[in-house]
């Protein structure tokens, strides 16, 4: 097949070579636009790829998990299940709290999802309990996303109730108003309230019941409209002393009369200022505190949000008393900034290394300056396009630019080398620039579009992984396009003005020595190539062996999803026996905190005990361990986690589960460990049968560690078995029984105190200090139909049973989540396969379904599409090359280089002990685009030699290989050195960048060595095949 002859008049570069001023000003414009774009771009850890997620929390103090599920969660789930665009709905119903997490499709705007959620809540309102203290509250936040900032508020002079009141009113509300903030939570449970603790014996002796007291309190404290008077000349608003504001006022409240004497609330109860929920507590290090966690909205920029908070914080803290101390314990943006700074440093290092290699090859300062200008100009110009595409400066886009350093210099090198060759032959610089640029223009276009073709499949990757790498692929493609433009405009213009025979011939001792070295290398390569061309079948067997080895390595290499990052923050879950009380759990938490804070890598610790929207049961505690900066500690986060777990194992009666926080959050639940696997059934009974069996087998697998389940069905329950006949005969209804129990043991919110700034609750309960445990039930009294007082024990028996501490649903069906980590000597792929094999051995019934969740599910999806992604990249490149060369054969020759890149990348990953994760796969796809450049440069010149000089195919490819050896070696080394800083990365976020560098460096080294010999052999093989095919067709035509 024929290709278009290269122009000797400069081609598309002619206009720019002949008009240097216009070309210079055009490049200055690109430079200024890029600088302005860089300053305007936001900074983040990763591209914003969050699923639209909304959390709905409903609190119903005193309700059991079963009541929460049936009375609150189920009605809401039925309404939410009808929403369009809903991807997944999970819920957790625990004692007094229902948390529903709604994850929507990526294409659905968060504001639209918010409107649908509000409409669903409104539709479910009439189905919820009438005495629900507050309606369901939704937040635009992913509960599994770690807080962007954690603050601890402490005071040595003020009670925690006053501290929380001030913080909630003066600080939390203001922070909630900041753009990008999704939720501000105050952990510690010290919200002010008036607590009424009834003396059961006292009210029994007076013939009263708790319901009598509750009715008296609710009737005595009201805040409703009273109207106004409108006279002939004046209007008067009516008001009254219907509100009671303090504990003293409640203490004086008359609740009944006996023999004409008043019975005041203080006579039968202890009334005091206290906390609304006494079973909640938070600590910062070892000090009781109010812990403020700030979470961002899905899609919000974490850096700008945190900057806004820090800017406002001094003003907010000034409004607090001096005895109140606000401490920032963690700020995720600190590590994000450090990671981005390290990546920017590696980008600058890559540019410096690339320029150094250029000088090593060209041995000429003017010739080195030209690509030294082209490289930063191409990269800086990319920022201008990124602004228009709403991208950000993040680890992936900076990685793309770092890799692009090796790409964009290739075009400039090829142009300079070709123009320099003509100048050295005696051509005038201007004529050489026109001739050299015209000759190489088609090659530049081929290189550019075939490389961009490799990136096209990345743009069509589905789900969150596709969104994640879209910015990477487009940023890299834009840099390559700008590089091609610069190489066809600025580079030849500068060559025509800066290069000359004198400058190129001017040599020093270094240049003469390096010239001799390169001449010897080229001569040695020529001798080796001649031998290889004489033994083509041996070379072909090597090429086929690399293809087979690539397949074998692909099958056996450990596979992962996303590198585990060291962001300096560890999330933890502390688990105690299921019957543990709040006091018992708080004591255990303090023991564990003492152990953790002794570790030299730990900077601070926050912990929380109690049941709320984030913690499902009293026997668990949430921990956040903040590590010292990476340069102030000796070990990475995984070693710190292992050390902490070993230390905490010595604390009796608790299990500690730890996992490092990650920039990429795909999960919607706060789990104990990194990976999740769910078991779903149509009933809780089915789960209770199969969960223990599966857990027993999974805990024996060496591929898994820290295996745990959120299935807790051994919570103690005091079951009140009422004799309904006896109760009915006395005129006592089940509602009366429930009310009596709720009044006594539910921390019941019975009334509201309204102030100008806030609202506070009146909490009713029995004082159980003298009657702990089940004995407190003997003090319950009910009112019969004739007004008499009836002990609960006369109509009911108390049975001790077991029940789940929380009930979880996934898409409205009961589910349990099994969490696990992966040991160091295994990969996530090994763990997933082991779980699937174990599941098959159990023969689960058809009503039991299993599914991986979060990052494990994303891993399966990414792994399934990886092969097709690579195939798509190869096909896309074949189509582009076929169109450019007008040939079916030459693209195959070019693509024959790919297995060598795969072998090199996979071997490098194995040697380095890295998994084949999505970052490494991106590196392999980029290698597909890089290594074919060698073949393109060889084939272009071989075809031109055959066409213009009448050489035989063997002579043409031999001369092309020797002629293009130096630029091939130079461009490969430039790409290799561009990836080298990533491979050697050790700073913050290095775990994310290193697999890309390792794969690319390994692939480039192996492919460079092999393709210099295999490509010419395959070129000649296909040439002979084409001639044989033509002769066969010609013979058939003659016979016909």
Swiss-Prot record:
<keyword id="KW-1003">Cell membrane</keyword>
<feature type="transmembrane region" description="Helical">
    <location>
        <begin position="968"/>
        <end position="988"/>
    </location>
</feature>
<keyword id="KW-0813">Transport</keyword>
<feature type="transmembrane region" description="Helical">
    <location>
        <begin position="440"/>
        <end position="460"/>
    </location>
</feature>
<feature type="transmembrane region" description="Helical">
    <location>
        <begin position="863"/>
        <end position="883"/>
    </location>
</feature>
<feature type="transmembrane region" description="Helical">
    <location>
        <begin position="347"/>
        <end position="367"/>
    </location>
</feature>
<protein>
    <recommendedName>
        <fullName>Multidrug resistance protein MdtB</fullName>
    </recommendedName>
</protein>
<dbReference type="Pfam" id="PF00873">
    <property type="entry name" value="ACR_tran"/>
</dbReference>
<dbReference type="InterPro" id="IPR027463">
    <property type="entry name" value="AcrB_DN_DC_subdom"/>
</dbReference>
<keyword id="KW-1133">Transmembrane helix</keyword>
<dbReference type="InterPro" id="IPR022831">
    <property type="entry name" value="Multidrug-R_MdtB"/>
</dbReference>
<comment type="similarity">
    <text>Belongs to the resistance-nodulation-cell division (RND) (TC 2.A.6) family. MdtB subfamily.</text>
</comment>
<comment type="subunit">
    <text>Part of a tripartite efflux system composed of MdtA, MdtB and MdtC. MdtB forms a heteromultimer with MdtC.</text>
</comment>
<feature type="transmembrane region" description="Helical">
    <location>
        <begin position="472"/>
        <end position="492"/>
    </location>
</feature>
<feature type="transmembrane region" description="Helical">
    <location>
        <begin position="998"/>
        <end position="1018"/>
    </location>
</feature>
<comment type="function">
    <text>The MdtABC tripartite complex confers resistance against novobiocin and deoxycholate.</text>
</comment>
<dbReference type="InterPro" id="IPR001036">
    <property type="entry name" value="Acrflvin-R"/>
</dbReference>
<feature type="transmembrane region" description="Helical">
    <location>
        <begin position="537"/>
        <end position="557"/>
    </location>
</feature>
<dbReference type="GO" id="GO:0005886">
    <property type="term" value="C:plasma membrane"/>
</dbReference>
<feature type="transmembrane region" description="Helical">
    <location>
        <begin position="888"/>
        <end position="908"/>
    </location>
</feature>
<feature type="transmembrane region" description="Helical">
    <location>
        <begin position="396"/>
        <end position="416"/>
    </location>
</feature>
<feature type="transmembrane region" description="Helical">
    <location>
        <begin position="16"/>
        <end position="36"/>
    </location>
</feature>
<keyword id="KW-0472">Membrane</keyword>
<feature type="transmembrane region" description="Helical">
    <location>
        <begin position="369"/>
        <end position="389"/>
    </location>
</feature>
<feature type="transmembrane region" description="Helical">
    <location>
        <begin position="911"/>
        <end position="931"/>
    </location>
</feature>
<keyword id="KW-0812">Transmembrane</keyword>
<dbReference type="GO" id="GO:0042910">
    <property type="term" value="F:xenobiotic transmembrane transporter activity"/>
</dbReference>
<keyword id="KW-0997">Cell inner membrane</keyword>
């Amino acid at each position: 097949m024929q290709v278009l002859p290269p122009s000797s008049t400069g081609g598309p570069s002619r206009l720019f070579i002949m008009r240097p001023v216009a070309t210079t000003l055009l490049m200055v414009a690109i430079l200024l636009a890029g600088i302005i774009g860089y300053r305007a771009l936001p900074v983040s850890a990763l591209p914003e790829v969050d699923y639209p997620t909304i959390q709905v929390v409903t609190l119903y103090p005193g309700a059991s998990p079963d009541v929460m599920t049936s009375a609150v969660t189920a009605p809401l789930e039925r309404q939410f299940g009808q929403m369009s665009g809903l991807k997944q709905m999970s819920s957790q119903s625990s004692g007094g709290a229902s948390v529903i997490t709604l994850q929507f499709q990526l294409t659905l705007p968060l504001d639209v999802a918010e409107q649908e959620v509000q409409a669903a809540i409104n539709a479910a309102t009439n189905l919820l309990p009438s005495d629900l203290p507050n309606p369901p509250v939704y937040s635009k936040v992913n509960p599994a996303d770690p807080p962007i900032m954690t603050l601890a508020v402490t005071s040595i002079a003020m009670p925690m109730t006053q501290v929380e009141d001030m913080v909630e009113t003066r600080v939390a509300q203001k922070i909630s108003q900041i753009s990008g903030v999704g939720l501000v939570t105050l952990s510690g449970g010290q919200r002010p309230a008036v607590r009424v603790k009834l003396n059961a014996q006292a009210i029994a002796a007076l013939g009263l019941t708790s319901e009598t007291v509750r009715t008296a309190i609710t009737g005595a404290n009201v805040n409703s409209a009273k109207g106004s008077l409108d006279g002939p000349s004046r209007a008067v608003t009516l008001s009254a002393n219907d509100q009671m504001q303090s504990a003293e006022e409640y203490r004086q409240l008359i609740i009944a009369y006996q023999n004409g004497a008043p019975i005041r609330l203080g006579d039968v109860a202890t009334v005091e200022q206290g906390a609304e929920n006494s079973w909640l507590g938070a600590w910062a290090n070892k000090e009781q505190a109010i812990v403020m966690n700030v979470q961002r909205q899905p899609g919000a920029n974490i850096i700008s949000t945190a900057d806004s908070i820090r800017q406002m914080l001094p003003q907010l803290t000034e409004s607090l008393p001096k005895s109140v101390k606000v401490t920032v314990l963690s700020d995720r943006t600190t590590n994000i900034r450090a990671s981005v700074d390290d990546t920017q440093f590696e980008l600058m290092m890559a540019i410096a290394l690339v320029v150094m290699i250029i000088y090593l090859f060209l041995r000429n300062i003017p010739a080195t300056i030209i690509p030294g200008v082209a490289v930063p100009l191409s990269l800086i110009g990319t920022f201008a396009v990124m602004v228009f595409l709403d991208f950000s400066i993040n680890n992936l886009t900076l990685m793309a630019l770092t890799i692009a350093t090796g790409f964009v210099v290739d075009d400039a090198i090829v142009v300079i080398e070709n123009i320099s060759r003509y100048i050295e032959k005696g051509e005038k610089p201007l004529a050489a620039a026109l001739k050299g640029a015209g000759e190489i223009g088609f090659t530049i276009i081929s290189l550019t579009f075939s490389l961009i073709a490799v990136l096209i499949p990345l743009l069509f990757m589905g789900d969150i992984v596709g969104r994640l790498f879209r910015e990477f692929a487009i940023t890299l493609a834009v840099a390559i396009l700008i590089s091609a433009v610069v190489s066809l405009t600025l580079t030849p213009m500068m060559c025509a003005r800066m290069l000359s025979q004198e400058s190129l011939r001017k040599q020093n001792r270094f240049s003469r020595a390096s010239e001799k070295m390169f001449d010897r290398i080229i001569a040695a390569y020529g001798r080796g190539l001649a031998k290889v061309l004489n033994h083509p079948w041996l070379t072909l067997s090597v090429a086929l062996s690399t293809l087979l080895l690539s397949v074998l390595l692909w099958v056996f290499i450990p596979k992962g999803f996303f590198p585990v990052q060291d962001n300096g923050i560890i999330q933890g879950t502390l688990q105690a026996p299921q019957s543990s009380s709040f006091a018992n759990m708080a004591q255990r938490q303090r023991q564990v905190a003492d152990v953790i804070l002794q570790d030299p890598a730990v900077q601070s610790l926050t912990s929380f005990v109690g049941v709320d929207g984030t913690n499902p049961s009293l026997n668990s505690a949430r921990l956040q361990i903040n590590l010292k900066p990476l340069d102030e500690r000796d070990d990475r986060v995984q070693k710190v986690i292992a050390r902490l777990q070993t230390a905490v194992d010595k604390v009796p009666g608790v299990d500690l589960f730890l996992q490092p926080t990650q920039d990429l959050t795909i999960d919607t639940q706060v789990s104990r460990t990194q990976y999740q696997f769910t078991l779903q059934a149509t009933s809780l009974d089915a789960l209770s049968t199969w969960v223990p069996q599966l857990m027993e087998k999974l805990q024996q697998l060496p591929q898994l560690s820290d295996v745990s389940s959120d299935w807790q069905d051994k919570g103690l329950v005091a079951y009140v078995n009422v004799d309904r006949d006896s109760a009915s005969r006395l005129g006592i209804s089940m509602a009366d029984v429930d009310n009596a129990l709720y009044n006594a043991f539910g921390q019941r919110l019975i009334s509201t105190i309204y102030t100008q700034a806030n609202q506070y609750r009146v909490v009713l309960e029995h004082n159980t200090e003298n009657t702990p445990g089940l004995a407190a039930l003997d003090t319950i009294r009910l009112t019969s139909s004739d007004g008499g007082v009836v002990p609960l024990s006369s109509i009911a028996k108390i049975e001790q049973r077991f029940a789940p501490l929380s009930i979880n649903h996934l898409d409205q069906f009961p589910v349990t989540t099994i969490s696990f980590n992966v040991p160091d000597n295994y990969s996530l792929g090994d763990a997933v396969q082991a779980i699937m094999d174990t599941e098959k051995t159990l023969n689960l019934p058809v009503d039991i379904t299993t599914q991986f969740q979060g990052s494990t599910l994303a891993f399966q999806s990414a792994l399934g599409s990886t092969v097709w992604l690579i195939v798509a990249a190869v096909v896309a490149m074949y189509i582009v090359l076929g169109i450019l060369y007008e040939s079916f054969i030459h693209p195959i020759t070019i693509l024959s280089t790919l297995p060598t890149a795969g072998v090199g990348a996979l071997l490098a990953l194995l040697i380095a002990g890295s998994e084949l994760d999505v970052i490494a796969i991106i590196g392999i796809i980029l290698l597909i685009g890089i290594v074919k450049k060698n073949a393109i440069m060889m084939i272009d010149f071989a075809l031109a030699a055959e066409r213009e000089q009448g050489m035989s195919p063997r002579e043409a490819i031999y001369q092309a290989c020797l002629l293009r050896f130096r630029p091939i070696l130079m461009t490969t080394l430039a790409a290799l050195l561009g990836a080298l800083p990533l491979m050697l990365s050790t700073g913050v976020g290095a775990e994310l960048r290193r697999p890309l560098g390792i794969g690319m460096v390994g692939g480039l080294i192996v492919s460079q060595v092999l393709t210099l010999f295999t490509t010419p052999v395959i070129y000649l093989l296909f040439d002979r095949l084409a001639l044989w095919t033509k002769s066969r067709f010609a013979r058939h035509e003659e016979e016909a």
